[in-house]
Curated annotation (Swiss-Prot):
Residues 96-185 are annotated as: Disordered. Cell surface beta-glucosidase involved in cytokinesis, cell wall biogenesis, adhesion to host tissue; thus playing an important role in the host-pathogen interaction. Has hydrolytic activity on linear (1->3)-beta-D-glucans such as laminaribiose and other laminarioligosaccharides. Residues 1-21 form the signal peptide. Keywords: Carbohydrate metabolism, Cell wall, Cell wall biogenesis/degradation, Glycoprotein, Glycosidase, Hydrolase, Polysaccharide degradation, Secreted, Signal, Virulence. GO terms for cellular component: cell surface; extracellular region; fungal-type cell wall. Disulfide bonds: none annotated. It is found in: Secreted, Cell wall; Secreted. This is Probable secreted beta-glucosidase ARB_04747. Belongs to the SUN family.
Length: 449
């Protein structure tokens, strides 16, 4: 696991106001990078007119690039509120984009999630209120019955194998207390709410980290590969049913900022690592957030296994015309990374790929897995839910050719993705969008509209 950082400096007139941004990278050599958590800024006020220059690692950046990076979690701001520069206050988490506290998205070099997102302001760009792209006229169909709308995505029209290949099932006993120290490490605890993800080849676990505790931190962390199992000294992470999330991770974390999560295997038995949070393996989110499909093929949505390996291995398979809860963590009670609250991040894959292909590490040739085109951030902080969508850059420039819109009666504004562009109340851009849920519930609706 590696940890890299960058420093973003802001020059003001003849004096300098210090601003910091960092990329917290962690994972395997082929891991993607995850967004950073935000720190409270530290700004010195200087009277007189201000001229701003943004410097990251010696290279100048535009205001738009900086604000977009702060909003989607790729950059950290060290200073006071940046309202006057970007139009929104300091946000909440790593991995959480402009408004939602979700762990961040990741590029090829892996990274770590961040704290809750910033305010529900639209992205920095405010172009000339461009119109949404008009739906192209349907090409004339050959004689014969009309076929239902087909995916306009770069993915194959027909997935390999069955329509729902190895879709994880389970969740039995989700409210059953876990019998600490009684279950063999090799027996996946599916009777206690955990959902086995067998296609990863890890005995049902979503990730296994072999750790060595040095004082109060894990000095070395080795991530298991397919074919390995949960053995003594390992932390063994797991998935939960839609609407639920894992409750177990140790207080100790990696010496260079890596996250570690799951049950501990000691003397051949599984032990809870976070009893003060829960003695159940899976706990519910705050509720009130859903995903809904209006199309006739499966869509694989994958949550980052965080804290843990931080790979997108927690499947949320949305069936054709399906409707499921999307887990929304509460910032004040869920995982904290280096003292900062975190939220959930999800990867949206093109329709037609089952979780066995989409919810694991991929490669640049296909827009799935860590190369999926779109990320979703979800989290609640201070009683307000923050929901966002943003492109999985710089990992990929792939475009998701479908529509995702956040709908609900109590939203702070508009947030809609269509064919790689994001629409807000003030216009359209390519950097993402965020809304808060002022009251009621909200749903991410997937369609070919």
């Amino acid at each position: 696991m590696k940890f890299s950082s960058g420093i973003l400096s802001l020059a003001v007139a003849a004096s300098v106001q210090s601003v910091q941004a960092s990329y917290h990278a962690h994972g395997h050599a082929h891991h993607h990078r995850v967004l950073n958590k935000r720190a409270d800024p530290d700004v010195v006020t200087i009277p007189g007119p201000k001229v701003y220059a943004f410097i990251l690692n010696g290279s100048e950046m535009s205001k738009e690039q900086v604000c977009a990076g702060i909003r989607d979690g790729r950059l950290d701001w060290s200073g006071q509120n940046h309202d006057e520069l970007c139009g929104f206050p300091v946000g909440m988490q790593k991995g959480s984009p402009p408004a939602c506290p979700a762990p961040s998205y990741v590029p090829s070099p892996p990274a770590a999630p961040s704290s809750p997102p910033a305010a529900p302001q639209p992205p920095s760009k405010s172009p000339e209120t461009p119109e949404e792209p008009k739906k192209p006229e349907e090409p004339k169909k050959p004689e014969g019955p009309k076929k239902p709308e087909g995916p306009k995505t770069p993915s194959p029209k027909k997935p390999d194998g069955p329509q729902h290949p190895q879709t994880p099932t389970g969740g039995e006993g989700v409210n059953r207390p876990f019998p600490d120290g009684e279950i063999d490490c090799g027996d996946f605890p599916s009777k206690y709410g955990a959902v086995p993800v067998d296609y990863l080849g890890l005995g049902g676990y979503t990730g296994i980290q072999h750790t060595t505790l040095v004082g109060e931190v894990f000095g070395t962390i080795r991530t298991a590969i397919a074919g390995e199992s949960c053995t003594d000294g390992a932390m063994c992470s797991y998935a939960c049913p839609p609407g639920y999330q894992k409750s177990q991770w140790p207080e100790q974390q990696g010496s260079t900022g890596e996250s570690v999560g799951g049950l501990a295997c000691r003397n051949g038995k599984l032990y809870l690592t976070n009893r003060k949070l829960s003695t159940r393996l899976c706990i519910s989110g705050v509720g009130g957030v859903h995903i809904k499909s209006t199309i006739s093929v499966e869509i694989s949505i994958c949550r980052t296994d965080y804290p843990g390996t931080e790979s997108e291995t927690v499947p949320v398979p949305l069936p054709p015309h399906g409707h499921l809860p999307l887990t929304c963590p509460q910032a004040e009670t869920y995982y904290f990374w280096q003292g900062k609250s975190t939220s959930a991040q999800y990867y949206v894959n093109p329709p037609g790929y089952g979780p066995a292909k989409a919810c694991q590490w991929g490669h640049a040739g296909l827009p799935i897995g860590n190369w999926a085109p779109v990320n979703i951030g979800v989290g609640e902080k201070g009683g307000v839910k923050w929901l966002s969508m943003f492109p999985n850059r710089p990992t990929t420039t792939a475009i998701l050719h479908m529509t995702i819109e956040i709908v609900g009666e109590g939203l702070s504004g508009k947030c809609k993705h269509k064919d790689g562009k994001y629409y807000t109340d003030t216009g359209v851009n390519e950097d993402g969008c965020t809304v808060s849920v002022l009251h009621g519930e909200a749903t991410f609706v997937f369609s070919y509209d």
